[in-house]
Amino acid sequence: TVIPQELTRGGLSLNAMWVRNRTTKTNGVSYILQKGAAAVFTEEGQREIHENIRVYKKNAAHLMAALDTLGIWYCGGKNAPYIWMQCPKSMGSWAFFDYLLHEIQVIGTPGEGFGSAGEGYFRFSTFGSPEDTEEAARRLVALLGK
């Protein structure tokens, strides 16, 4: 919204009133976010959170089993929703990203995106659906187990 500085009503700057209104209305966390955050602490909210965590742990188990089968070093997945693996065959993290994308249409996050120390590592998320995660794990084993 553009309100010219020169625009006044009753000797008051409409621009200044608009800025005051917007900064007051948007000061702090919005009402809908506050209500959503409070819902976490209800019985239903707790049930849903625990169900989501159960799904994420199941997804992690599928990915970790695939990496175990392949003998690839990894960490995470047990107490975090991410699994970090070492890229196979000394591949760079972006090269591995491209390889997975083109060969089996599976994606993750190249470690180099987190800084130079991440080069040679790759991060998988467990936030996908169980079906997609199982399929990704199956495809990983099929591709890298050759």
Predicted regions and their residues:
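PLP-dependent class I/II
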Residues: 1-146
